């Protein structure tokens, strides 16, 4: 019986070493991350951004659909009515530590105001830096507008 267990154990070690050697001589599939970047899918969901119209006016009409549909309750919106009767946001906050990047806010938005952009490098050392206010979201939208617009055009037929 002991001989059987020893031979079984030896067999497993040899089998494991064979598997290791099989992959040892194959080309590496990992990348050297900060210096090399892997391609990103066109439907990648990254850092949030608020978009503007071509004339510079923000797109958000304060319908609060994104706030209502967010499963993590990461979005907080406050709005006021303008003199012309339209509504605009006075406060638009997203707690990125709560966000699960599901994309439901982007799907719910009737005017494509809130989108998830291509940026995935927004780590921070503090919690407060990951609570995005309206100004930060608009800056993200201005910075990534070209990429966001082309991404939405490519995906338009599927929406």
Swiss-Prot record:
Localization: Cell membrane
Cofactor(s) the protein needs: [4Fe-4S] cluster
Organism lineage string: Bacteria, Pseudomonadati, Pseudomonadota, Alphaproteobacteria, Rickettsiales
Record's bilayer topology term: Peripheral membrane protein
GO cellular component labels: plasma membrane
Annotated HAMAP family: NDH1_NuoI
Family: Belongs to the complex I 23 kDa subunit family.
PROSITE patterns noted in UniProt: 4FE4S_FER_1, 4FE4S_FER_2
Entry keyword annotation includes DNA-binding: no
Keyword Ubl conjugation: no
Main location (coarse class): membrane
Keywords: 4Fe-4S, Cell membrane, Iron, Iron-sulfur, Membrane, Metal-binding, NAD, Quinone, Repeat, Translocase, Ubiquinone
Protein name: NADH-quinone oxidoreductase subunit I
Superkingdom classification of source: Bacteria
Functional description taken from the UniProt entry: NDH-1 shuttles electrons from NADH, via FMN and iron-sulfur (Fe-S) centers, to quinones in the respiratory chain. The immediate electron acceptor for the enzyme in this species is believed to be ubiquinone. Couples the redox reaction to proton translocation (for every two electrons transferred, four hydrogen ions are translocated across the cytoplasmic membrane), and thus conserves the redox energy in a proton gradient.
GO molecular function, one term: quinone binding
Quaternary structure note: NDH-1 is composed of 14 different subunits. Subunits NuoA, H, J, K, L, M, N constitute the membrane sector of the complex.
Group of enzyme by EC: translocase
Biological process (GO), any one: aerobic respiration
InterPro entries (UniProt xref): 4Fe4S_Fe-S-bd, 4Fe4S_Fe_S_CS, NADH_quinone_OxRdtase_chainI
Cystines in this chain: none
Binding-site residues for [4Fe-4S] cluster 1, renumbered to this chain: 60, 63, 66, 109
NCBIfam families: NuoI, PRK05888.1-4, PRK05888.1-5
């Amino acid at each position: 019986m002991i001989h059987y267990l020893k031979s079984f154990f030896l067999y497993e070690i040899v089998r494991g070493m064979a598997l290791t050697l099989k992959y040892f001589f194959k080309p590496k599939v990992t990348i050297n991350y900060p210096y090399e970047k892997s391609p990103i899918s066109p439907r990648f969901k990254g850092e949030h951004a608020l978009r503007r119209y071509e004339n510079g006016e923000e797109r958000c009409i304060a319908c609060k659909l994104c706030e209502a549909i967010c499963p993590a309750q990461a979005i907080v919106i406050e709005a006021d009515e303008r003199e012309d009767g339209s509504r605009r946001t006075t406060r638009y906050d997203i707690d990125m530590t709560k966000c699960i990047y599901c994309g439901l806010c982007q799907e719910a938005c009737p005017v494509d105001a809130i989108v998830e952009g291509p940026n995935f490098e927004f780590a921070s050392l503090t919690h407060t830096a990951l609570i995005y206010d309206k100004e930060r979201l608009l800056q993200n939208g201005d910075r990534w507008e070209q990429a966001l617009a082309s991404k939405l055009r490519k995906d338009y037929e599927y929406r």
